[in-house]
Structures are given as C-alpha cells and as structure tokens.
Regions:
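TRNA-recognition modules of translation machinery and tRNA-sensing kinases, especially anticodon-binding
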Residues: 126-429
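N-terminal alpha-helical targeting/anchoring segments
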Residues: 1-131, 145, 149
C-alpha cells in the first residue's frame, strides 16, 4: 500500500511512476484523492457535531434548575445523534471504498529502473561459461525417466497434468538440493521457520498478491467455515504476515528468515513446447529467503540477498547471469527486482531460478508492520524483502541436463554428494 501523503503531495508523479510499470492507475489515484477528502470532511463534521452535542447537553441541568422547558434541547440532541449516526454510516462506506482503491495500487518502482516490460530488462553481470556438449544431449524428461528419478505418468494419474513423483535417487537428489540450500542459509545466520501450507485471505492481501491475483491460487472449500483459505503459492505470502499488526523493537531488526515449502500454483494458460516436464508445474519445492529491515538498511539487505542467491547457483556449477528487471516486469508488490537466470540445454535462452525483490514499505503498510525507533520513540514502517533461495523446479532439470554424460548417466554436483552418501554418478541400473 502506498503512503497517502505522498499521493496527495504529487499525484501526477505517482501516476507517471505507475505508468512506468505499464499500469494505468490514473482513475484510481483521482478517486483515492476524492475519497480521502470526503473522509476528512465526514470526520470533521462528526467531531463538530459531537462537540455541539456535548455543549448542548451541559445546558440541561441549568435549564431544569431555572424551571425552563428542556424538551427542545432533547429534540436537538436527538437530531445531532441521528446526524452523527448518518455520518458514521457514510464514513464506513467511504473508508471501505477508499481501502479497496488503495489496495488496488501497485508499488512504485525505484526511480533508477527503466520503464516498460521485459524487453527493457538489463543484464548486469555474467558468471562462468555456457555449458557445451560433444554429444547430442537428452531432455530432462527422458533422462529422469530412463534413470528412474521422476515418474511423470503416475504423477498425472494421482493429481492430473502438471504433477510428478520423485522416486528413488530422484527423491534423494531433490532432498539433497533442499538440504544444501538450507545449510547455506543456516550458516549465514538466517532463522529457519516451518509454515502452514494453508493460509487465510489476509496473508495474500498483505503480500500484495490479493485481490488482483486471487484467481491464480488454489482456494479451499470449507462448508463449516466462511473464511477464505488458499494453498500457499510461495512462502513469501506467509512470511510477509508473520509480523502483521505488530510493533517491533529496533533491536530485533533485521529479522532474517528462510522457509522450505511446497508451492501450489494454478499456472493457467498454455505452455510452450520447450516447457514440458518440470519447468512449469502446479506443485514444486522452494526455499524462500525473507528479511524485515530498517528502512535505511533495505538497500544493503537487497544486495545481501542477491549475493546469497548467486552463491547458491555458483555452488552447483552453473553459468548464470543477473538481470535488473525493468519497472513493468517487476511484480505488483515490488519496487525493485533482480533475477538470477541459468540456461537449461533443452530450452532456448535463459530461465529465471531466483527473483530477489525489495518491497520497501509497501507490504508493511498493507500488513501494518512497524517498529519503534530507539532514538526518538517514533513508530515507523519496516521494509520487507524476499528472494528465492532456491526453487528446485528449474534447478533440478538444469542440473540433470547439464551434468549428463554420453552414456546417459548423470554426475552429481560435488556440493550434493555428502547428502547422498558420497554418490558421484547416477547410472542406469
């Protein structure tokens, strides 16, 4: 949620920045200003009527003492009471509409981002060299099927298209990846949390994913409960709400966390031919990094998260590039995003394996997450940041394809071998 004071100070600048995100919010900004003015007028009117009501009520004892008729005074007080009730009712409606419009606005992009969509994304740096083969490489679907690592057919039988089963060494390899990621985060002093996989609507609203993207998650029907629940699409959705409606101590910041969760996405729409297999599924495993920071420390925290994601990818031996997203390619909640992208041999170009983002105070305002500054005692909004650290749905197929040998076996990355009892090569039995 944006700061209403900033909107009022320069509404045209707000409109311009949001257009850089390829979003037309002119109507929303204008309506918010109208509703804010109406809200203030109603509050002022109510306060004036309450003051008048209090003043009139003080006349009653004196008039009674003087033997005068107090019926007109009671009539006046009744009229004031009714007017206050009407104002309160109108204020409730205005504030509800005001909040709806405020929630609809995306975050403002950082001023140094290029306007427009992904065509204006800017590669910042490259690491390593693209992998080259001296034989015709196989697709990860064929490799995993031949080696008994993934069972796509039975996964579809159990849950439909877009699901799979990790089997045997495939399950252990997946778990090795997750353990490698977790050990790295623990070594960096991040707190591990285990989250619910089912969340209430307010979590999606705080993260900035609802109401706009509410149709992209799996909702859960519960005939005995009228609350809206949904399956977790990413741990960020839950982590952003851990401190919702709290005032934190400055000494408790930064709060650095990570969480492993399965992620559930509807992934509506058709997929390209080169996206068969694990690249786009309805359920995948991911470890999410998250920081709650002081406002003046969020740029530093962002660079830390980017470096952490890059180091995880480096550790697995991948060539990658780090890309600064243009304003229109950043998600609605984020002011800034860098993607770490790798090459999957069976696919064209680079594919994102981690997005690291800074929401500034956008999520904090939506979730009322604040801290008390020690020097002044002032209550301020925190900043929140998140980053994939990492998701396996693209790392796994890229790892399998890049590490394949001509005989169809797969070399296990060195950093994963300790989780597999020292296994160096996965071969067909």
């Amino acid at each position: 949620m944006l700061d209403i004071r900033r909107i009022k100070e320069n509404p045209e600048e707000i409109k311009r920045l949001l257009r850089a995100k390829e979003v037309d919010c002119d109507e929303a900004v204008d309506r918010i200003l109208e509703l804010d003015q109406k809200r203030r007028e109603l509050i002022a009117s109510t306060e004036a009527k309450k003051a008048e009501q209090n003043k009139v009520s003080k006349q009653i004892p004196l008039l009674k003492k003087q033997g005068q008729d107090v019926a007109p005074i009671f009539q006046q007080m009744t009229e004031l009471k009714n007017q206050i009730a009407e104002n309160d009712s109108a204020l409730t409606e205005v504030e509800a509409e005001y909040r709806t419009w405020m929630l609809s606005l995306p975050n403002l992009p950082d001023p140094d981002l290029k306007a427009g969509g992904k065509e204006n994304n800017e590669p910042l740096r490259y690491y390593g060299e693209p992998h080259k083969f001296d034989f015709e490489p196989k697709h990860h679907v064929d490799l995993c099927t031949d080696l008994g690592l993934i069972d796509y057919e039975r996964g579809t039988k159990l849950a439909g298209t877009g699901f799979w089963i990790y089997t045997g060494l495939g399950a252990r390899l997946e778990w090795a990846l997750l353990n490698y990621f977790m050990d790295c985060h623990l070594a960096d002093g991040y707190e591990m949390v285990i989250l619910p996989h089912m969340l209430e609507y307010k979590c999606g609203e705080t993260a900035g994913q609802f109401p706009k993207f509410a149709d992209e998650v799996y909702k859960i029907a519960n005939p005995t409960d009228d609350r809206i629940h949904f399956m977790l699409p990413t741990a960020e959705t839950a982590l952003a709400s851990i401190h919702r409606d709290e005032i934190l101590k400055q000494s408790d910041l930064p709060h650095k966390m990570f969480a492993y969760t399965p992620c559930f996405r509807r992934e509506a729409g058709s997929h390209r031919a080169d996206e068969r297999g694990m690249v786009r599924g309805h359920q995948f495993n991911k470890i999410e990094m998250f920081q709650v920071t002081l406002p003046e420390k969020s740029d530093e925290a962002f660079e830390e998260l980017v470096t952490k994601a890059e180091n995880l990818v480096k550790g697995l031996g991948f060539h990658f590039r780090t890309v600064k997203l243009a304003a229109g390619d950043c998600s609605a909640s984020m002011a800034r995003t860098y993607d770490i992208e790798i090459q999957i041999p069976s696919m064209n170009g680079y594919k994102e394996v981690s997005s690291v983002s800074n929401a500034r105070d956008y999520q904090a305002r939506r979730g009322n997450i604040r801290f008390r500054r020690e020097e002044t005692g002032k209550i301020e909004f925190v900043h929140t940041l998140n980053g994939s650290g990492l998701a396996t749905s693209r790392i796994f197929p890229a790892m399998v394809e890049q590490n394949q040998r001509a005989d169809g076996s797969i070399v296990v990355p060195e950093v994963l071998r300790k989780y597999l009892g020292g296994l160096e090569v996965i071969e067909r039995k």
